[in-house]
Amino acid sequence: MDIAELLAFSVKNKASDLHLSSGLPPMIRVDGDVRRINIPALDHKQVQALVYDIMSDKQRRDFEEFLEVDFSFEIPGLARFRVNAFNQNRGSAAVFRTIPSQILTLDELGCPKIFRELIEQPQGLILVTGPTGSGKSTTLAAMVDHVNKNEFGHILTIEDPIEFVHASQKCLINQREVHRDTHGFEAALRSALREDPDYILVGELRDLETIRLALTAAETGHLVFGTLHTSSAAKTIDRIIDVFPAAEKSMVRSMLSESLRAVISQSLMKKTGGGRIAAHEIMVATPAIRNLIREDKVAQMYSSIQTGQATGMQTLDQCMLDLVKKGQVSKAQAWGYAKDKRLFE
């Protein structure tokens, strides 16, 4: 069985990921659960051959030197895949994340209308956060797609690797892949300010300089989209501030309070009847929220989000209560994610 057949099987079964691991049969993740494929275990040489088959010479060299490598590739007519190849105690291994070739719209994802209002603002910072596999890339792709279909501007993306590929519609789109088109997020963001963008998507706010440059870009008239692996709005603010040395924290709080537009923290939950659905905590940067950021009163944010529904805000619990009422998510499923467990007993 070649890699294309395995990936076609994976896509046909609506798997989010295909896992190859020496010494074990291939496995797929469907609706959050890992399941074995009914074929014999693969040894080290078989896994390596399957993965090497789709790598460029440079990717093979990087894999041999660094023992792991990230890249993306496409099977035309099937899907794109984000790949991480690595070594483990039994030999080679790889994970293929499926990136659908069709970009879902904000409506198809069931996103609240505040998402559209946020991305129609001329400048600022919009953060989409959540654990790995929570659908951040899918949400951001829908936002970029909305801009692309409705605005006349220049969208610049910096990704590692490129996931969803956007065709220019009303907007000019340039997508840059780290290690292929640029040496890193920081270098690409420095250049971005001289490339006349209106919208900048930063695949991941990984380090101090990338965060600093994203804040600067948001302050200087660009709408910047970024992701972090944080699970709530309050933790996101803390994470950004904590990256900076003590002497700069006050200045960064001030910059963030001015440039932030919203933090959307999402969790991907099992849907009643199969499939998955995103639940969102949404914090909009109202004057009250800006004040809390500036004055380092992050602990008070949750209650502001709870009472801010008129401005489009909601806690994860409020969102899940709505999903439970609609019959889209079970109480038991929501209970595992809830801050106030009593709501779902």
Language model regions located:
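Short, flexible helix-loop junctions that flank or precede catalytic/ligand sites
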Residues: M1-E345
